[in-house]
């Protein structure tokens, strides 16, 4: 599954953005601004929230060390803040420190055992670590929380994780549920199309990827490559060549174009 399910990167990004959205803020970071100069609220909880919001912004920009500094400040003000521990888990996971990431997620769940967002994040971390049965448990727990409102996101991540584990039937079922709830999401459509291709459901796979490629802003080298692989299997050679032309015109430096030109359609 080297370049198939390449959309997993899309999922990781989308999951991260969704988590950061929970840390919504009106604080703006500029290059010249020193966040230490931000006036600190007197209330410890409010002070922790401000620092956590800044941490989320820095994490979203890839400034992991600065994000960790802000999380440390937030936890100094409010040590039992589950969101701070959860975000710290995401930061450590993105840095490749699995031990500290897991410690942070577990601490967050200890403080807030019914927090679906943390279960989702921990589940995705476990999937990245190829601990698929444990990841499945966390996704199911998140979906079972009555107050959890991000089920579509979790179904998407769960479906991708099931595909990574080679559980194609379950993955199709899970991704189909996610698609039914959010049919406009191109990430879900892409992954569902990929899984259907794997299962030999070529016409159905073609349906979903065509929905993506019919919207100019959603077209990527990955979606064109997926369409090319499907149409080649179907024997639609005119469509196959059209996908190749689009790859050359729109994504001339993409790895997918190189694979196309070398005829490596089964990778």
What are these regions (language model features)?
Residues 28-39, 214-267:
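Terminal, low-structured helical/coil segments at or just beyond the last alpha-helical repeat
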Residues 41, 48, 82-83, 116-117, ...:
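Helix-start (N-cap) detector for alpha-helical repeat units in TPR-like alpha-solenoids
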Residues 43, 77, 111-112, 145-147, ...:
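Structural marker of alpha-solenoid helical repeat scaffolds
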Residues 43-77, 94:
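Alpha-helical segment of the N-proximal tetratricopeptide repeat
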Residues 53, 87, 121, 157, ...:
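Canonical tetratricopeptide repeat
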Residues 60, 94-95, 128-129, 145, ...:
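Register position in tetratricopeptide repeats
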């Amino acid at each position: 599954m080297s370049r198939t399910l390449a959309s997993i990167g899309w999922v990781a990004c989308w999951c991260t953005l969704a988590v950061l959205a929970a840390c919504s803020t009106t604080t703006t970071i500029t290059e010249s601004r020193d966040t230490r100069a931000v006036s600190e609220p007197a209330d410890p909880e409010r002070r922790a929230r401000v620092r956590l919001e800044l941490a989320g912004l820095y994490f979203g920009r890839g400034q992991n060390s600065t994000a960790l500094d802000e999380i440390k400040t937030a936890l100094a003000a409010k040590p039992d803040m589950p969101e701070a521990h959860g975000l710290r888990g995401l930061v450590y996971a993105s840095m490749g420190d699995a031990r500290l990431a897991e410690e942070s997620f577990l601490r967050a769940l200890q403080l807030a055992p019914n927090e679906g967002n943390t279960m989702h994040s921990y589940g995705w971390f476990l999937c990245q670590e190829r601990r698929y049965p444990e990841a499945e448990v966390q996704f199911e727990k998140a979906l079972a929380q009555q107050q959890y409102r991000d089920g579509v996101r979790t179904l998407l991540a769960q479906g991708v994780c099931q595909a990574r584990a080679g559980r194609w039937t379950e993955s199709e079922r899970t991704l189909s549920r996610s698609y039914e709830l959010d049919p406009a999401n191109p990430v879900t459509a892409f992954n569902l199309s990929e899984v259907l291709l794997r299962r030999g459901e070529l016409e159905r796979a073609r349906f979903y990827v065509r929905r993506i490629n019919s919207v100019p802003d959603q077209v990527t080298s990955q979606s064109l490559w997926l369409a090319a692989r499907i149409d080649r299997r179907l024997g639609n050679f005119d469509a196959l060549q059209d996908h190749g032309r689009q790859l050359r015109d729109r994504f001339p430096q993409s790895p997918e174009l190189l694979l196309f030109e070398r005829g490596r359609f089964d990778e």
